[in-house]
């Protein structure tokens, strides 16, 4: 199966890039090779991405704003939100009553060096967090507050708390249905969709869904997981090295190449190498960011109470920005989903490599992710933004992109 998938992806990549280079001769004279390549790739993939976006983010009208315009909810957000609530109730609020056990498990209290797997609970947690703590906590929160007002923060926190149950479920399944061959762990939605649904007599459906997930996961990792991050990092580098006159302004590909090589050095060693790097990098990264945020907050400590007041008031105010309460709620759920990836299926791939005999133990550890990512980091970001008081500026959201 893996060879067939690899073969299909290879053919797809070959045809895509062949068509890209086939268009090169028609480029305008004087244009650079990289510029032409960028334009060609965009022209080839934009129709595909647009169609996928129209399907995935198909919006259902649920209300109207003050001007009578419909307020729409993307069906995928409703699916994620309802699933998170159902899991919370079904597992008797595991996301609220298992914190102590989660921290004990992360510290290795119930671990043994002989347990099957490749990485520790802490390494698995940081490996998964490395993919969620980032621009979603900064620009994502800024967009939520800029569009939905301070009240979006409340719904973002609430979605983060319920999302802990979704993370618990998917990561437990990732360990339960993983396969270990010659010391190497293979896990994630590809495994539990195939094997789990197979046990229910739905093997064909499971195989099809696993195949689709693998393809879409690769696409998502290229876009939101890599291109978005690299683009924003490059933009910041250009800004601090001279702006338009910076070397990287006209040679962005150089930055991309450097970043690609740096990432390649890490991932070429597999999950063990990735986990070792993230175990050292993620705590430092989060610590530096939180320290900077706390300096801002404590420097303006007198505004903290007012900021929380605006958050709670905006969450339930009928005249809230962007379509009333429903509009604010949508913004909060959107940014929480983008930030913590609860229910997306990416985290189980990292968590399935953990050393443990009990699948649910890693699910307990995984539920800490949305709490750290959304409830702590995103809330801190929102406080800084609300205290600054610039979120209602018309140009506020655009300064992040």
Question: Which residue ranges define each predicted feature?
Answer:
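Alpha-helical membrane segments and immediately flanking helix-loop junctions
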Residues: 114-147, 173-176, 182-196, 212-218, ...
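Membrane-embedded translocation segments of transport machinery
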Residues: 268-279, 284-357, 369-370
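Selective recognition of specific alpha-helical transmembrane segments in multi-pass small-molecule
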Residues: 162-170, 256-271, 282-302, 335, ...
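Helix-loop-helix module between adjacent transmembrane segments
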Residues: 87-88, 129-130, 159-185, 194-229, ...
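Extracellular/periplasmic helix-exit of transmembrane alpha-helices
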Residues: 23, 168-178, 182, 292-310, ...
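Membrane-interface loop-to-helix entry segments
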Residues: 3, 79-82, 87-103, 213, ...
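N-terminal alpha-helical transmembrane segments of multi-pass membrane transport
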Residues: 5-8, 14-135, 145-150, 163
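Flexible loop linkers connecting adjacent transmembrane helices
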Residues: 93-121, 143-153, 165-203, 391-401
């Amino acid at each position: 199966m893996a060879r067939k998938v690899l073969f299909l992806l290879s053919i797809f990549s070959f045809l895509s890039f062949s068509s890209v280079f086939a268009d090169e001769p028609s480029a305008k004279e004087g244009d650079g090779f990289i510029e032409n390549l960028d334009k060609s790739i965009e022209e080839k993939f934009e129709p595909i991405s647009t169609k996928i976006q129209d399907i995935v983010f198909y919006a259902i009208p649920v209300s109207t704003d003050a001007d009578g315009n419909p307020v729409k909810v993307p069906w995928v957000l409703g699916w994620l939100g309802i699933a998170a609530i159902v899991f919370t109730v079904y597992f008797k609020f595991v996301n609220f009553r298992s914190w102590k056990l989660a921290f004990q498990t992360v510290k290795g209290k119930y671990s043994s060096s002989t347990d099957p797997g490749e990485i520790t609970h802490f390494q698995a947690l940081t490996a998964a967090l490395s993919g969620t703590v980032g621009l979603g906590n900064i620009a994502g929160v800024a967009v939520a507050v800029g569009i939905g007002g301070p009240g979006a923060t409340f719904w973002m926190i609430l979605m983060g708390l319920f999302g802990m149950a979704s993370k618990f479920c998917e990561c437990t399944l990732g360990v339960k249905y993983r396969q270990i061959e010659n010391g190497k762990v293979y896990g994630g939605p590809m495994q539990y969709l195939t094997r789990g649904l197979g046990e229910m007599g739905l093997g064909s459906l499971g195989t099809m869904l696993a195949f689709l997930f693998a393809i879409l996961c690769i696409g998502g990792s290229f876009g939101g997981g890599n291109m978005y991050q690299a683009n924003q990092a490059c933009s910041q580098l250009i800004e601090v090295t001279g702006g338009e006159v910076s070397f990287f302004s006209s040679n962005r590909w150089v930055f991309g190449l450097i970043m690609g090589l740096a990432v390649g050095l890490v991932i070429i060693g597999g999950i063990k190498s990735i986990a070792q790097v993230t175990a050292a990098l993620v705590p430092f990264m989060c610590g530096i960011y939180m320290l900077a945020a706390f300096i801002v907050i404590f420097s303006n400590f007198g505004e903290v109470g007012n900021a929380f007041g605006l958050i709670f008031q905006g969450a339930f105010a009928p005249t809230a920005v962007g379509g009333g309460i429903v509009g604010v709620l949508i913004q909060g759920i959107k940014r929480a989903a983008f930030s913590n990836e609860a229910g997306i299926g990416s985290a189980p791939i990292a968590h399935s490599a953990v050393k443990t005999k009990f699948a649910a133990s890693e699910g307990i550890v995984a539920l800490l992710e949305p709490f750290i990512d959304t409830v702590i980091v995103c809330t801190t970001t929102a406080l800084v933004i609300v205290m600054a008081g610039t979120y209602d500026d018309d140009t506020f959201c655009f300064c992040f992109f």
